[in-house]
């Protein structure tokens, strides 16, 4: 048995008269509070005064909005906008649309920056010339810090994964009494070495190469040899496609433990994923956050040699033989990333549901290929006994449905009571997308692959940047189609 492991701010738009569904830090407190962007209430300013909160500052001057309607006549809009100029209200964004109330009127949406006094004076003047549909006064100004202060922290850029990877929950150099290596002082010292390597690693550095001992290589060899016998009849086709490539480019052999740096470079070229070393178990939130960046946290230590076919924790045999071959598949990589993206800023309850779905798909998932059940879960593909069991008549197999799968108990030291099957990765991905819509968040997230950062989609301007990227991609597709029409006569 192997161990495992576009929504907008509803408050923002409700103040504008809309109803839309569903976060974010600057600093992450490693210990203690797990929420974000707390207002500064303890620092002194340059004059020695106690720092006032960002909420108070926003009341004096900040972003606000108003929607008003005008008769559809010449000069009406000019007169209204002149009032903004007179009251020195800066217009940041303006939109117009046909009124839903009267066909003879047009509604104007204005996003602006001003103080409370100026805004109130502007509204009084607008009332004489327009009909106010909805407004967002400065005392209710939306600010990212206020809106997201109760949202659990998550990394906004890939380098912040350094914080996640150092918060190991269990094992590392400290082993439980029932661990096979608990009484082996040599093994415990070796584990401490791997902890030091992982804790010292920073984003952007090459992953340190490890000189594995003869005992470690022998243990790896036993696992590699026995599992390789089962893969042709038990593993999914995507796994079987990539496994020989790992042998060719990353040194996957019975007598050699692959190096994470070589594996990471291989994955980067195949699917955009990379790996980074980790000392042991991470919390579901921290682990899934890595997937959002297409980063897989990977251990470097080898299980204890006294029982090569069992480990109570994820080791490098589990990571390299179970996870890596499928992370090289673009569709599987996207499926993994979308689970990670859905977890960012989600509640503890929703993260646990996502982690359970992850457990029964990416760790213990089954799929159908050519009418036969095949394994794609890493926990199965790195466990001889459970791989045989999951594809036998003795296993309880159910159709994958995130709504029910998330309620299934995850078992660590025994075989699972149930396994979940999907027709394809694409089907599982679509089901997870639908399930993610039920997660309550006051925002949506977008992974920017160019800056390797997470963008918060909270207003029309932030969405516009994403649309620009999509437009560029669509132009490329249209150009390709035009050339096919021209040269191939399609």
Curated annotation (Swiss-Prot):
The keyword Iron applies. Brain specific. Its EC number is 1.14.16.4. Its cofactor is Fe(2+). Fe cation binds at residues 318, 323, 363. GO terms for cellular component: cytosol; neuron projection. Residues 65-140 form the ACT domain. Belongs to the biopterin-dependent aromatic amino acid hydroxylase family. This is Tryptophan 5-hydroxylase 2. It comes from Homo sapiens (Human).
């Amino acid at each position: 048995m192997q161990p495992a492991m576009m929504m907008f701010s509803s408050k923002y738009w409700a103040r504008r008269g809309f109803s839309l569904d569903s976060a974010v830090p600057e600093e992450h407190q490693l210990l203690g509070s797990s929420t974000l962007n707390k207002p500064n209430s303890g620092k002194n300013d340059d004059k020695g005064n106690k720092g006032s909160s960002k909420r108070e500052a926003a009341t004096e001057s900040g972003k606000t909005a108003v929607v008003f309607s005008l008769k559809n006549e010449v000069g009406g809009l000019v007169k209204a906008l002149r009032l903004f100029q007179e009251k020195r209200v800066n217009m940041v964004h303006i939109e117009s649309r046909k009124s839903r109330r009267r066909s003879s009127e047009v509604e104007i949406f204005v996003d602006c920056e001003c103080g409370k006094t100026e805004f109130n004076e502007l509204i009084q003047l607008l009332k004489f010339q327009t009909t106010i549909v909805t407004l967002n006064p400065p005392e209710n100004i939306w600010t990212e810090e206020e809106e997201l202060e109760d949202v659990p922290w998550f990394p906004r850029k890939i380098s912040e994964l350094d914080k996640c990877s150092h918060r190991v929950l269990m094992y590392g150099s400290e082993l439980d009494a029932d661990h096979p290596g608990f009484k082996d002082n040599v093994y415990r010292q070796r584990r401490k070495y791997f902890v030091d390597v992982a804790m010292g690693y920073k984003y952007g550095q090459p992953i340190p190469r490890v000189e594995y001992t003869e005992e470690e290589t022998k243990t790896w060899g036993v696992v590699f040899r026995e599992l390789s016998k089962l893969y042709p009849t038990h593993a999914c086709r995507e796994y079987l496609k990539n496994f020989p490539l790992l042998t060719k480019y990353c040194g996957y052999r019975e007598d050699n433990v692959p190096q994470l740096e070589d594996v990471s470079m291989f994955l980067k070229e195949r699917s955009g994923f990379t790996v980074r070393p980790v000392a042991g178990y991470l919390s579901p939130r921290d682990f899934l956050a890595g997937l959002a960046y297409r980063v897989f946290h990977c251990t470097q230590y080898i299980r204890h040699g006294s029982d090569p076919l069992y480990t109570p924790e994820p080791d490098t045999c589990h990571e390299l033989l179970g996870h890596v071959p499928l992370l090289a598949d673009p569709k599987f990589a996207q499926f993994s990333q979308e689970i990670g993206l859905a977890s960012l800023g989600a509640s503890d309850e929703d993260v646990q549901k996502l982690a359970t779905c992850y457990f029964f798909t990416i760790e213990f998932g089954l799929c159908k290929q050519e009418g036969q059940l095949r394994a794609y879960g890493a926990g199965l593909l790195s466990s001889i006994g459970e791989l045989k069991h999951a594809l036998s008549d003795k296993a309880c197999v159910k159709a994958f449905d995130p709504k029910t799968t998330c309620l299934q108990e995850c078992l660590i030291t025994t075989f699972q009571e149930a396994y979940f099957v999907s027709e394809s990765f694409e089907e599982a991905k679509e089901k997870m997308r639908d399930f993610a819509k039920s997660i309550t968040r006051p925002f949506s997230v977008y992974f920017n692959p160019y800056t390797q950062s997470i963008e918060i989609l909270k207003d029309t301007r932030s969405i516009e940047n994403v649309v620009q990227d999509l437009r560029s991609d669509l132009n490329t597709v249209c150009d390709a189609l035009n050339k096919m029409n021209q040269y191939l006569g399609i």
